């Protein structure tokens, strides 16, 4: 009987870990949905904190790991996080009240700073999704 309980325990831990991960992903999706929805809403400081927290929960301290790799301004960190969760560049431009070209150039420059290689905005996106 004890052997059976020991065999079940790892499965139970896996199930609990899966549940924790699922909850974290649901939380992130809920937070990100606001950022993806172009309407009259503009994120406040608490919304950005909520976004960072949810991303870090799902993506193994993403913001901390990224900031340890390279210095980022507040705007650059926000663009990196929005890119990580696949918010469209047009929506990012709308959130920052700037042009799509401005966002594309920022993404390109960030890729070059982070990797030390010449690149493009789409290369930045791919790098963010893998990091």
Where are these regions (language model features)?
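Cytosolic nucleotide-binding catalytic cores of signal-transduction proteins
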Residues: 42-131
